[in-house]
A protein has these predicted regions:
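Beta-strand-rich modules
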Residues: 421-442
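Metal-dependent peptidase/peptidase-like ectodomains
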Residues: 184-296, 308
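Conserved aromatic anchor
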Residues: 378-391
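Short beta-strand segments within Ig-like beta-sandwich modules, predominantly Fibronectin type-III
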Residues: 409-416
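Active-site-adjacent mobile loop/cap segments within catalytic or ligand-binding domains
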Residues: 50, 217-238, 285-363
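N-terminal capping segment at the start of a domain
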Residues: 22-66, 320, 328-329, 335
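A non-catalytic alpha/beta surface segment that caps or lines the substrate-entry region
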Residues: 41-119
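Alpha-helical metal-binding/catalytic segments enriched in His/Glu/Asp
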Residues: 116, 132-133, 137-191, 352
């Protein structure tokens, strides 16, 4: 009987924790940002980008009306205009690199990213960066045709327009961490612009805590005729394909954390934040680096060791992707504006903006989170390094069943650096730790490493 009572007590303790959910209190600034995103402005931006006829990275750089040069100068001027209207706190600049001759580059070619940086307001968080991108270059059926009509309305004027709109709206507001709004070139030539930036960021030691790329986010009608207006796909990598496995990844695998990579923790946070503020949109988290054997501008950031994810529409139409503009057998081919759903693109921008704002307002993910493994027991003890931000007031232990994709239970604790969760065994669930600030904003989850002195 005594044994039965003890067992019942453990069950009661382990099942009395509340179900996990994002912070119930919404941030009024994030709500305003979401409302201010404009489908009309996004449409105007996409049509303007298409008006340059081609934005192929090998195209004209001298003309003011045609080619990649005219496009990038217009993007920069548009971001500068918004910056001037919003107080001038954002730094807008070209990030230029020279691409050598390669399979998709006939001659050495300048690849120019347009980068707008909104510095964080909190001293302890200013070096923490969240970056959002879209690629402004376009292509026809071949990436090495610099002169033919390549409108690129969906791929990727849609993502570029979303990034410009976010920069223009969000630069009115203040965030603890730094936000970077970047439109890149050379994506169709092999992720050149993003690769140059990510490698340079790694060398500089930039603390990019999260990166989202938006690529092909404007179409709602797939090749099969199915229309989906309320979903967006979010691709997040697990264990990366590495020739040599660093100790941190080995520890992740040994402890059953294959589904808890930094990219997937970021993606879970994005999904939770976005669906709170844009409830009509469903963020479909897909546990894959990208679409099957395909790629995007988040790859170089992943390869540099940063948490990076990709957003894209749920059901692509390949008649309007990487196609010469033509009518064939009564079918219109080509990436034209009439095949972009501008209202949907605005909703995707809202999803991004809500997630980015939540990340930049909230605290940093806890550091050096360890799960103690000194003895065999059914309780679970953690220790970690305290966050530096003065407004952090506590931490939250979260967990889920090993087969569950999202966090299910949590326990809030005070502003301490060690705690024990009683009656929940590390054998049976996956744990994580979040920081919480005085307003209830939560950080991205940190997966704990095993600790045995």
């Amino acid at each position: 009987m005594r044994h039965l009572i003890v067992c019942l007590l453990v069950v009661i303790v382990s099942t009395s924790f509340p179900a996990y959910s994002a912070s119930p209190k919404k941030n009024s600034d994030i709500e305003k940002i979401v409302k201010e995103i404009s489908a009309k402005r996004i449409e105007a931006t996409i049509r303007k980008l298409v008006s340059f006829e081609t934005r192929n990275s090998l195209s004209d750089t001298i003309s003011d009306t045609k080619g990649v040069g005219a496009a990038r100068r217009w993007i920069k001027s548009e971001m500068e205009r918004c910056n001037a209207e919003n107080g001038g706190r954002m730094k807008v600049e070209f990030d230029e690199h020279l691409a050598p001759v390669g399979a998709r580059v006939a001659v050495p070619t300048p690849i120019v990213n347009v980068v707008a940086t909104l510095p964080g307001e909190q001293t302890e968080s200013r070096d923490r960066i969240y970056l959002v991108s879209g690629h402004y270059d376009s292509m026809r059926s071949t990436p090495i045709d610099p002169d033919g009509f390549a409108p690129g309305a969906n791929d990727d004027a849609s993502g570029t327009a979303a990034v410009i709109e976010m920069a223009c709206v969000m630069s009115k507001y203040k965030f603890n961490a730094t936000l970077v709004f970047m439109t890149v070139a050379g994506e169709e030539q092999g992720l050149l612009g993003s690769t140059f930036f990510a490698k340079a960021a790694k060398v500089k030691g930039m603390n990019i805590a999260g990166m989202i790329t938006n690529d092909i986010v404007g179409n709602t009608k797939g090749s099969d005729g199915k229309v989906v207006r309320d979903h967006v796909r979010l691709f997040a990598e697990g264990i990366p394909p590495l020739k040599e496995m660093p100790d941190e990844w080995i520890a992740l695998i040994r402890t059953g954390g294959e589904n808890d990579s930094p990219a997937r923790q970021l993606a879970r946070h994005i999904k939770a934040s976005a669906e709170r503020y844009v409830p009509k949109m469903k963020v479909d988290l897909i546990y894959r680096r990208d679409r099957y054997l395909r790629g995007g501008d988040h790859f170089p950031f992943l390869d540099a060791g940063y948490a990076a994810v990709r957003m894209t529409e749920p059901n692509e139409d390949f008649h309007h992707q990487h196609q010469n503009v033509r009518v064939e057998n009564g079918v219109q081919f080509g990436d034209l504006p009439e095949f972009v759903d501008f209202a949907y693109t605005a909703d995707v921008a809202r999803v991004n903006a809500a997630a980015l704002a939540s990340l930049a307002i909230g605290p940093a993910a806890p550091r050096e989170v360890l799960m103690e493994n000194m003895r065999l027991e059914n309780n679970t003890t953690f220790r970690w390094t305290a966050n530096a931000e003065p407004n952090v007031t506590g931490y939250r232990v979260v967990w889920r069943e090993t087969t569950a994709p999202f966090w299910q239970k949590f326990e809030d604790i005070g502003n301490v650096t060690r705690t024990t969760v009683y009656g929940v065994s590390k054998d049976n669930v996956v744990f994580g730790l979040q920081a919480i600030d005085k307003d209830g904003n939560v950080s991205v989850v940190t997966y704990p490493k095993p600790f045995r002195p």
